[in-house]
Amino acid sequence: MSSMTTTDNKAFLNELARLVGHSHLLSVPANTARYRKGFRSGQGDALAVVFPGSLLELWRVLKACVTADKIILMQAANTGLTEGSTPNGNDYDRDIVIISTLRLDKLHVLGKGEQVLAYPGTTLYSLEKALKPLGREPHSVIGSSCIGASVIGGICNNSGGSLVQRGPAYTEMSLFARINEDGKLTLVNHLGIDLGETPEQILSKLDDDRIKDDDVRHDGRHAHDYDYVHRVRDIEADTPARYNADPDRLFESSGCAGKLAVFAVRLDTFEAEKNQQVFYIGTNQPEVLTEIRRHILANFENLPVAGEYMHRDIYDIAEKYGKDTFLMIDKLGTDKMPFFFNLKGRTDAMLEKVKFFRPHFTDRAMQKFGHLFPSHLPPRMKNWRDKYEHHLLLKMAGDGVGEAKSWLVDYFKQAEGDFFVCTPEEGSKAFLHRFAAAGAAIRYQAVHSDEVEDILALDIALRRNDTEWYEHLPPEIDSQLVHKLYYGHFMCYVFHQDYIVKKGVDVHALKEQMLELLQQRGAQYPAEHNVGHLYKAPETLQKFYRENDPTNSMNPGIGKTSKRKNWQEVE
């Protein structure tokens, strides 16, 4: 821990309180708990959690932390799945200050909505809502947006998404603070917007919304992953289409994983797809879906909007354990989900202190709540579930609808399986069911925590030319599992594989065996959730982290790297 004395820390905390106000500073462990604990796992100590109310306040808080030689952990929604948003244990050599950016939630629309300027606390949901009247969409829709995830959090972690044509979250235009080799805090404006010269001028102009059209330059730098469409169509390439550590997608704020303090990002938006149609495809032979994917990517003039895979087992788990999530979104809309997600987090944190309540009380209560309602899935989906093991939800738009329908009719004259053209309600519910699958495995583990050891959640990216995408585990691994749950973004070959592990199994040892199998298959991992504190960062990613943070003062330890100042290794 830090060598600073208690008196020094008291003076430091007083300085933070002076900068942001006493009501926006937490230092009592009971009050900071929900910011120190990860979404799925991971936690550690922190000296304080501070909530700046403007970009200029954020700059001043950062300066105070650097002067006091504190570790800085930038945190927005704390929805990361691999522990990258929180402290990891208590073996750091300096005190940790968590800077929560939730109050910094402004959003600036540029031009006619073709681009936006997102701030540290801007959520995907608020961005989606602001763009809808303009007929535009952000990089990602229903998914992370439902749990209040931040736009900049996605950029910093190369987050993926279900939309085939948009690739991972990426930009080359951002405003960020970096601690340089001399330990000095510097502000770098690569937004392509004229904001002034000094940090105070730059940040005040953003805080006061004084950006004019004439300030905005278009200098050829990219504000989304511009060539992803060409990469995903290259079905003969022996590398994945996208994954977190892809060196071609690491650029300043993009992929920095908290090694920079990002103040704003400039992003492209996308024209909302009109006349969408969902085709629900089922088969018992994985090679049928392989042929469909390869043909569509190589030959279709119109790429799908989305192509989501579900195995029958995750279909069943999601039907039972994702039912309340499905019903809440279906009946109340996505705009209520961040509120309920936040409420659940606060309730869990409060009930943890009360011995009377069993662990996962809210999960158990919500599970029983879901049982009160009748079956929620359309009859044709249930029929396809009974007939077929493998399901593909193919969403097309515009001219792609006719193109897909005519080809699928011809293809299934000879191929095993079938498809049906969804009604609007069926299509909406099919994709909502797929979304509910993402949290269903976590709910299963919570409800059955007395009976299962844990959930082992992997997200992997397969090589684009791989034809053996469906996993077959050796008996010695299979015997340690209760359930194997496979779902993912099929056109991108990005899969989420959740394993419910039997009671008494060494989950860490099992994970190492799993990762070894993935390495043998040429897969990359993680694909979307980033390394956090659960995966070792490849050498190229470690090099990127060192370049961004030479003193190792920002989110140290990420990717299983050193937690010590100046990247010193433990002797």
Segments (PLM) and residue ranges:
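Conserved glycine-rich FAD pyrophosphate-binding loop
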Residues: M4-T5, F39-S41, D45-L47, K70, ...
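General beta-strand structural signal in soluble alpha/beta enzymes
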Residues: L25-P29, F51-P52, I72-A76, E83, ...
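Glycine-rich N-terminal segment of FAD-binding domains in flavoprotein oxidoreductases
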Residues: A30-T32, R36-L104, A118, P138-H139
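Structural signature of FAD isoalloxazine-binding scaffolds in flavoprotein oxidoreductases
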Residues: F51, L81-D105, G161-K184, K259
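A conserved active-site cap/scaffold subdomain adjacent to cofactor or substrate pockets
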Residues: K274-A306, D313, K320-K368, P378-Y411
